[in-house]
């Protein structure tokens, strides 16, 4: 069995390959000791690690492991997944939306990191908790699906009420900028959480589009664990990307790009 692991700040993504079959699983990074214990009990032919906590795992296992730079691993794995899923892209920006967000340009041969922001799944969980007292990510995202941002976010159409706006009316003029105009409204936890996911999605997308224009590509690939069980984030990102004139792409199991890529990088 071959095992690739992307040990991130919040989640550990694990890919196992055996008999041309691939299996995926995740574990919370706070349970890294359990992952180490599991690894030490397996018959592993090849173990490859990436991510910020790769060194912690390598120091505590009784089998040899190779460690790779997470950006290179993610790019390698994403290329494999894109090909397997029928996406033939000459070049693209990819946004890896994990705890934070890392932005990369792939020119058809290699990747280069072109930016990063602190907005991502960590903000959804942290700010989401402050607004709702909910700690479970799935519960947060499930609740957000039913939310309405209309009384929270100020849209361009809210400003240009009786005239044609110079930019699309559905663009957000100010996240949370409509709140003071609706002080008598019932700001439910669902509405507040939907607004949090909205600002995360729009900031990530805006940054991705900015670098896409800089590198003259219209293709943006979104990956990362923040999209897991988060249809609203995916919709926000997809709609906003199209609205701004670019093409969004998602890949199944994209959050495991780093773990897959580590298996196929060679030292």
Swiss-Prot record:
CDD domains: ASKHA_NBD_PanK-II. It comes from the Bacteria. It is found in: Cytoplasm. The active site is at residue 70. Its EC number is 2.7.1.33. Not regulated by feedback inhibition by CoA and its thioesters as described for many other pantothenate kinases. Competitively inhibited by N-pentylpantothenamide (N5-Pan) and N-heptylpantothenamide (N7-Pan), although these compounds can also act as substrates, being converted to inactive CoA analogs which inhibit a number of cellular targets, especially fatty acid biosynthesis. SUPFAM superfamilies: Actin-like ATPase domain (SSF53067). It catalyses: (R)-pantothenate + ATP = (R)-4'-phosphopantothenate + ADP + H(+). GO terms for biological process: coenzyme A biosynthetic process. Pathway: Cofactor biosynthesis; coenzyme A biosynthesis; CoA from (R)-pantothenate: step 1/5. GO terms for cellular component: cytosol. Signal peptide: none annotated. ATP binds at residues 6-13, 99, 121-125, 137, 225. Pfam families: Fumble (PF03630). It is an enzyme of class 2 (transferase). Keywords: ATP-binding, Coenzyme A biosynthesis, Cytoplasm, Kinase, Nucleotide-binding, Transferase. GO terms for molecular function: ATP binding; pantothenate kinase activity. Belongs to the type II pantothenate kinase family. Catalyzes the phosphorylation of pantothenate (Pan), the first step in CoA biosynthesis. PANTHER family: 4'-PHOSPHOPANTETHEINE PHOSPHATASE, PANTOTHENATE KINASE. Homodimer. This is Type II pantothenate kinase. It comes from Staphylococcus aureus (strain NCTC 8325 / PS 47).
């Amino acid at each position: 069995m071959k095992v690739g692991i992307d040990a991130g700040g919040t989640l550990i993504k694990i890919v196992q390959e055996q008999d041309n079959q691939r299996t995926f699983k995740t574990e919370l990074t706070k349970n890294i000791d359990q992952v180490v214990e599991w690894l030490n009990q397996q018959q592993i032919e090849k173990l490859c690690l990436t991510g910020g906590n790769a060194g912690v795992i390598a120091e505590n296992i009784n089998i040899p492991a190779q460690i790779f730079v997470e950006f290179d691993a993610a790019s390698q794995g994403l290329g494999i997944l894109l090909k397997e899923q029928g996406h033939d892209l000459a070049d693209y920006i990819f946004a890896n939306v994990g705890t934070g967000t890392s932005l990369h340009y792939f020119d058809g041969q290699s990747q280069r990191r072109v930016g990063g922001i602190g907005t991502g799944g960590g903000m959804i969980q942290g700010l989401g908790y402050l607004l709702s007292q909910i700690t479970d990510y799935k519960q947060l995202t499930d609740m957000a699906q039913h939310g309405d941002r209309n009384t929270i976010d100020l849209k361009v159409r809210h400003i240009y009420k009786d005239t044609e706006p110079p930019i699309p009316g559905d663009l957000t003029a100010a996240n949370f900028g409509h709140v003071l105009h609706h002080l008598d409204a019932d700001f439910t936890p669902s509405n507040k959480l939907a607004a949090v996911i909205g600002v995360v999605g729009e900031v990530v997308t805006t940054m991705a589009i900015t670098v896409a224009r800089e590198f003259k590509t219209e293709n943006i690939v979104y990956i990362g664990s923040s999209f897991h069980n988060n249809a609203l984030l995916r919709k926000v990102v997809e709609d906003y990307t199209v609205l701004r004139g670019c093409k969004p792409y998602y890949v199944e199991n994209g959050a495991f790009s780093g773990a897959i890529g580590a298996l196929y990088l060679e030292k």
